[in-house]
Amino acid sequence: MSDKSKIMEWIAEAETTADASTMDIPKRAYNDRLVAWIDTLAMRNKMRESDDAEEIFTIMGRLQNYVENACENLVAKGKLNYLQISDGFIIVADLDCVNELCEILCQIQWQVLFYSQMLLRGALTAGKVSMSDDSKLIIGPAFIEAFAMESENAIFPRILFANEIKDYIKEDEIVFSYLKKDSDHFIYLDFLKYMIDKEQITTKELKHFLQTQGVKRLLVEGYSKNILKSKHLAQKHGWLIARFAEYKIKLS
């Protein structure tokens, strides 16, 4: 047999083997899931301005701990997965976890504000998504929608609750009672009211907590420093100051 014939035989054998192995691999499919994207504000500027890599890694690790601790029960049940991308997180959960996921997102937002003195915003939606077997890659239109909502519509330190969720979940199954419509008609998770009620925090205790944790300083200075040079930044702090005012907590 000529060398050319041998080569053609090898190619044919390789193609046959490849076809057979491909047939054994199930095709990946999109599934309907809840998808949240949350992201801290001003972290990019901190990374640009800081030459201390250890400081940035410490912040990232702290954020990861908040998410890991809040999600651990649903992760253990195989009903939730998450992926950290820099200072942002994609969280994917089963549709029947809508109430638990809302609570998880509120807890994370509270911890980021009070224990890391950072603002967080995001979006929660539902739709088609697919994750790799090792959970290191997430794709799908629902993730794109959550990311777009956070970057284009959230604006303030709030986590939006998409109307699309009700296309996948019956309205009477959504019993989380801390959904609030903002002045621009977007629905968001009222994490302050949720945590105040859950922890039974009094107004006096909350005022003390805001002072001792540095949150009051963060918001007041963030607003006053930016009101003249960057209204876009000032309004983020101002929005949260106004939310505290709704619960009789005057910061400015």
Cite the ranges covered by each PLM segment.
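Intrinsically disordered, glycine/charged-rich C-terminal tails and inter-domain linkers
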Residues: 2-25, 155-252
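Catalytic NTP-binding/metal-coordinating core of nucleotidyl cyclase/transferase enzymes
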Residues: 3, 7-103, 107
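A structural signal for short, well-ordered beta-strand segments and their strand-loop junctions
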Residues: 37, 119-125, 158-162
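Short, electropositive, low-hydrophobicity segments enriched in small/polar residues
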Residues: 46, 131, 144
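A general alpha-helical scaffold signature found inside nucleotide-binding enzyme cores
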Residues: 58, 103, 140-147
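Catalytic core of nucleotidyl cyclases, primarily class III adenylyl/guanylyl cyclases
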Residues: 72-100, 112-141
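Short secondary-structure capping micro-motifs at structural edges
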Residues: 106-110, 134, 144-148
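Catalytic/regulatory signature loops of cyclic-dinucleotide turnover enzymes
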Residues: 115-117, 143-165
